[in-house]
Structures are given as C-alpha cells and as structure tokens.
C-alpha cells in the first residue's frame, strides 16, 4: 500500500473544493509522482498494460519465492536437485535425502509466514478502504465524478491494477487452501492411526490371559477361600474375553478367531470342573441337612414352624458366581445341576411340609360336624336352624364373630385353634418358607420371577368363581354324587399314592430340556394332586378349551424347581379345606378371603412376590369355591325336593329360614365389598332366592285355578320375605326385596277382591253392569233399563243394609284369620287394604246412584268405616 502511486494523479486534477482535495492530498501525499505518470495513458492498450505491470510495487516475498521462476516452480534449486540426484546414486544418498526433506520443511514454514503476512496486508487494505469510504461519503462520489469527467483514463489504470491484485490474491487463497487441505488430511490420518493403535492395544489386552489365569482355569483350587476367589476372577476374565463385542471387522480377524478357539477349550474344561464341584456340594449338603433334620426333630418336637437352613444357604452362596457363570457360558451343563438340586432338596422339603402340617393338626380344636343344611327337611337340620334363630334373635351378629373364640388352650397346654384359624396360620408360615426358598433359587441359578404382561389375566383368574358361571358348575356337580363313583375315585387316588411311594423319583424329576414352561394343568404337574372328593365332581364335565400356550421364557425352570420342591403343599391345604367344609361350610368363606389376600399381595409387580405361590393358592381357591358351590347345590336340592301342601300353610319353612341363612353368611363376609368371597356370597343369595321363588311358583301351578290358596300362599310368603329383606338392609338384596314387594301387592289385591266377593258379589256385579251401561247411555236413561230399574235398585239396596254389611265383613275377617298365620301383622294389613278398596268402591256406587236415580244409599261411607272398626275390635284372632 505504501508504494501505490495515487497522489500524483489526484493532485493534478485541480479540484475546486478544497475540503475534499485537502483530504485526499494529505492521505496520498506519501506516494511520489514518479511512480505513476498519467501521460503514459495515451499509449496503446498493450503498452499501457505492460507499463502498469512494471509500475506496480513488488511485495517482499520469502526467499524461496524471490528466486527465478524456474526455481520457484520447481521447488529447490537446480544445483540442489542435481546434487541430490547425484548423491542418490552414491552410498551416502540417505543423508542427501534427509537434507531435501529438511529443505522442504523450511520452505513449508516460509509458506506459513507468507500466508500470515498476506492475511495481515489484506485486513489492513480492507479496513482502510472501508473507513475511507465511510468518512468521505459525498466527497468520494464528487471526486470520482470529476475524475471520470476530466481524466477517466487514470481510473482505468487503477481498475486494471486492482483487478490484477485481486487475481493475485485469489491465486494465493487457492494455494493457502490447498496447503490447509493437505494439513487436514495429514491430521485425520494421524488421528486414525492413534485410534487404531489404541484399539489394537485393547484387543491385545482382551485376547491375552495371564499365566495365573490360565493355570487357574486349567487346575482350579476350590477348596480354600483364596483359590475359590482366584477361580471366580479367572472365570470372569475368560467370560470377558469370549463375550466382549469387538469393533466392526475385528471379530473376523484370523488371530482373534484362533485365540477364541483356544479360550473355548479353556471354557469347556473349566465348566466341566465347576459342574462336578457343584454337584458334589449338592450331594454333601443333602446328607448334612438330613442329619440336621433328624437332630432338630428329636430336640424340638411339636414346633410349629419350618426350619430355615440359613447356614447351608450361606455355604452354597459362596459358589453362586461360578453357577451364574456356568449358566451364561455353558447352559447345557446347568440342566443336570438343576436335576441334582431337586433330588438333593426335594426329599428334605417334603419331610418339612409333612412334619409341619402334622404338627399343627395337633392344635386343631375339635368341633362337632354341622353341615348347616338350612333348607333340609330333616329333624336335626330343623333343630340346628332353631338354635341359630334363637342366637340371632337374642344377639346382633358381628363380622367374623367366630374369631372371638377361635383359639383356646387344651389339657396338654397346646394352643387350640379352629380349622379356619389354623388355615390362616399355615398360609403365613408357607409364605415365608416358599419365599425364602424361591429367593435362594432365583439368586443361585440367576432366575427371575417372570412378571405378568399387561392386559393378560393372572393364571389363577380362570378358577371357578361365584358368579353366574357357578350355577352351571353346580348343576354339573349335582349329577355326580353317586357313592359308587366316590368310592372308585378314592380307590384310584390311593393306588396312585402307593405307586408314588414305591417309585418316588419316577415322576418327580421332570425334564428340563429346552427350558419349556410348566403347564399347571398338565396331569404330570404335582399341584394337580387334589383330593378324590374334588376330582370326582369334575370327572364327567367336558374339559375346558385349552388355554393358549404361554410364551417360552428362560426363567421357566424356576416354576419347575418350585413345583418339584413343594408338590405336597396343595394336597395338605386342600385337606384342611375339606375338613373345614365338613365342620362348617361357612368356614370356607374365611379361608377364601385369606387365600385371596395372599393372591392379591403376590400379584403385584414388586420385589416381594411369587408367581408360584399365586399358582398354588389359585388351586386352593378353586377347591374352596368348588366345595362351597357344592354346599349351595345341597341347599338348592333340598328346596327342590320339598313337597308340601299350600292349604293354610302359612310362611313356608324355606322362606322362614332364608334370613337366618343370610345372617350366618354375613358373619363371614369381608369388610370390603370387593373380592371373590363377597361375590361368592352375593351369588349364593341370588341362587337361593331364585330357587325359592321358582319352587313356590311350581307348588302354586299344581293347584286348580279356583283355589284360593294359590294367591294366599304367595301373599303371605312374599310379605314375610319382603319384611325380612327390609330388615336385613343388604344392598345386593334390594332388587329381590322389590320383587317380593311387587308379588305381595299383586296377590293382596287378588285376595281383597276375593274377600269382597264372599258376601258382596251381587252388589259389585250390579254396579259393574251399571258402569258398562253408562259408557253408552246417559245417567237419566239407566232407570229405564229392565236390569237397572228403580225396582231392581230397591231390591239390591235392601240386601245390603247395615246389619248385612256387618255380617259380610265378619265373614271376610273370619276368612283372613282362618288362612293367615295367627298374630301375623299381615292380618291387619289385609284388613286395612280391604277397608280402603271397599269404601272406594262404595263411594263410587253412591255417586252413580245419585246421578242415575236421584237417590242415596241406605248406608253411608262413614257408617261403613265405623262398621270396619267395630268388627275388627270385637273379633280378635281366635285360631
């Protein structure tokens, strides 16, 4: 910028405005006029261009660029290259090559210096040009216009110089970008080489096992703590070398493949040693625990709890990392270990279960068997119901009142419990026992309790409930009560048990191949060992459609192990359920409630749940519902089989006993309105009520149409039923209460009309016919009808004077007292309704008599009201 010749050309323009000329002359006075001669612009275009090129100031380039064109373009000097070429043929060519490279590096540094200097120069030029334009503003425009007018040729030269300089700058920019591109490529290559070097180091470290690790894998020492720790660490190193996922392509390297083949041989050998070690531990533990069981049983007889075996679990947990490694690295060798584990511990667990249940049976309180046949016609049943009725009439039933006297102390000091309380205690102990064993199996064999998928029903939800489906189940069971079939089932069950005792391992070591999930409905499942009395009830029913096969899970053996270990739990629990059914079927409801509380608790997806515990309780739940539905069917059959006369029958026994049945059931109902036990109770009410209504309708249909007992029996029984349901005030019975009230009112109207017709039928018929005539005739024409003339009117009213009306009401009252139960408030209800209907009719008769005959009835409606009151007071119920 210092050598540009602007000032000479600008000073000769002769600008009139001193302000702008002074600024420009001051700015460019530093340049000499000799550097730029405007007279030379008259030359030819080519000469002018060459002249400008010669007058453009030359920047100071680096030393290697200041040489001749040949030297700059060809890099190093000819002498250097020739000497280098000559020296390449000599023995010391390596040193000359090094000199060439050093020269190249020095030249590269000069390029960097040049690039930096050019950048600074360009920045200065751009800044000064922009500042000058902004400061000059209008003055610049005037100067340019004057320059264009007076000497445009000078600007042409300046423009050419600027274009040349721009071209040089563009070339320099391309050169700089070229250099930067090479530098970037070199940097990328360097970075990739570093990453490759790092990955190769990692691969070498991963594919290399130390000598100690190899010796441990080859000859592990499991007997001492240090050797076991070294074996676990060596197993982890081997696992990492075999399973770590390498970068793309590295796993296909021949060296990696060969090394992993060697590691596979280590894995196979080490897995075989681990499997043998764990199997020996299981066998040893089996013997030790067997001795422990014998010792503790002899020392603490009658102890109502399960042994914990914590010290043996702690011993086995030391080898847990090796078992977990074996499952992940060689799962095929784990399968025989699971079978060995089952064989080692199943016998011990079966012994624990039998001992526990036999021990708690000693604390069972003896109770007399009471089937509570509320609707049976036997004398013992009537006696039992009468006692219940007396108890409920003198005391208010409370929730779970049976628990107040559920336990007592016997002569031997053992705490006595009722069967339902004993069942609850057994469930609490079983939960702890099973959860402890399950947690150990899950931790030791690295299994997870499979969570239930969202939207899927639990595997226990298919058990028979107390809803509408239970009606069908009950009807199916009703046809299966023959004693021969029960005996046959019990015999078959006994044969199966004997066979199982002879060959305990034949059916108790199911295959674990392929980790197939366990089907609880399979005949081989140990949880299907239910009592013969239950299996016989479902023998002739068609099998339900098979459920869709569950998805296979790697954790399915967990259920298999637990099923094999605790195959005696379900039969023991069902045995307690059957004993409770024999003593008091209502105990089944409390058992069902307790069972479902555990099912709900273990159906939640948290850390403390057991799908297996839910499964075995679901079988118990199903058995409880089956037995209770069977009890209900006994009650239904008792109702159906009852044949009785409806003549002056009063309230039938079955209708009288229903509220007692309800009160007893309510004692065993849970406080919450949800749950299967509540649904079962409510469905029981519905089933019995519908059967009662159908049974009474069946008895009524057998009577002739003209029999008064058809409506009298319905009237009295449904009135009693309505009052009792109203007294119970149970929400689920509201609909049935309304139904009984409707039937009662319907038959009340029929009976009242029947009573009126006993003595007042002619009067009713006379005025009924008159109402029909009034539909077509005016009231004044009625007296001209032969059937309703004034003479006929006088005859009819003469028959129903005061004394005759009183006799008619006496006869009606006598009929009511004769057919309705003594001291029943229904008598007064009927009498009051009779009074309402009769007076309503009589007042209507008075109105049409006045309209048609212009006369009055001999007895007024007020007099009739007095007659009703007098008759009822003078004639109390005498029968």
UniProtKB/Swiss-Prot annotation:
Pro residues: compositionally biased ranges: 541-551
Amino acid composition bias (Basic residues), ranges on this chain: 480-500
Subcellular localization, as worded in the UniProt entry: Midbody, Midbody ring
Superkingdom of this protein's organism: Eukaryota
GO cellular component: exocyst; Flemming body; plasma membrane
Primary residence: other
Region (Disordered): 29-94, 371-413, 455-557
Biased composition (Basic and acidic residues): 40-52
One record GO biological process: exocytosis
Coiled coil: 165-187, 226-248
Low complexity bias spans: 77-91, 373-409
Keyword terms: Coiled coil, Exocytosis, Protein transport, Transport
GO molecular function: phosphatidylinositol-4,5-bisphosphate binding
Biased composition (Polar residues): 64-76, 519-532
Membrane-traversing stretches: none
Function (record text): Component of the exocyst complex involved in the docking of exocytic vesicles with fusion sites on the plasma membrane.
Complex formation: The exocyst complex is composed of sec3/exoc1, sec5/exoc2, sec6/exoc3, sec8/exoc4, sec10/exoc5, sec15/exoc6, exo70/exoc7 and exo84/exoc8.
Family: Belongs to the SEC3 family.
Protein name as annotated: Exocyst complex component 1
The organism of origin for this protein: Dictyostelium discoideum
Lineage: Eukaryota, Amoebozoa, Evosea, Eumycetozoa, Dictyostelia
Gene that this polypeptide is encoded by: exoc1
